[in-house]
Design a protein with these regions (language model features):
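A conserved helix-loop-beta module that forms one wall/lid of the active-site cleft
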Residues: 1-11
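Short small-residue beta-strand/loop micro-motif enriched in glycine and branched aliphatics
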Residues: 5-6, 78-79, 131-136
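ATP-dependent carboxylate activation and anion-phosphoryl transfer catalytic cores
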Residues: 87-175
Length: 175
């Protein structure tokens, strides 16, 4: 998750560069390597929360060509996550369709890339970071949910779904 294994060498422009990068990753991680076409453009994310719907988006602005694992996990001044509303209502409908077609349970972060006024689906991620300043929480805040609101909601829904609410004594904390 979080683009682990990705860095500035991950964007390649020739077969030789591709081969070198794939071999390096196979040696380092000893597992399959996913290769995708690179699409230039603006990164943005939305989230889906079952029972609430599509929230966000948040737009990632960073000084680097690639928003890598380190930037996602160690926040600094090179990354600015902005929120915006307005032009994204149609994208929210697309997120709802994705959630329905993939039968997403619980929650997911859906990443897009915008190029020439077109949105390209990059990935659907069900293993998201709940870092208070990360994309998932920032998207929730766009639609008025606080960190505590969204975390408590997700935990409560998960416990209801798994019928464990009373067996472990979980209690939602009121703010």
């Amino acid at each position: 998750g979080s683009s682990m294994g990705m860095d500035e060498k991950s964007i390649v422009n020739s077969y030789d560069e591709l081969k070198k990068q794939v071999l390096s990753l196979l040696e380092k991680y000893d597992r399959n390597v996913l290769v995708e076409e690179y699409i230039e453009g603006q990164d943005l994310s939305m989230i889906y929360v079952e029972g609430i719907g599509a929230l966000g988006p948040c737009i990632v602005n960073c000084d680097s060509e690639f928003y890598d694992y380190e930037m996602k996990t160690i926040k600094d001044d090179t990354v600015d996550i902005q929120t915006t509303n307005g032009e994204f209502e149609s994208l929210k409908n697309i997120v709802l369709t994705i959630a329905e077609k993939l039968d997403i349970k619980g929650y997911a972060k859906i990443d897009f890339r915008k190029k020439d006024d077109k949105y390209y689906l990059i990935e659907v991620n069900s293993q998201v970071s709940f870092h208070p300043t990360g994309e998932f929480i920032t998207c929730a805040k766009t639609d008025g949910y606080s960190f505590d609101d969204i975390i408590n909601y997700i935990v409560e829904k998960a416990l209801e779904t798994n019928d464990k609410k009373n067996s472990i004594g979980y209690k939602v904390i009121d703010n």
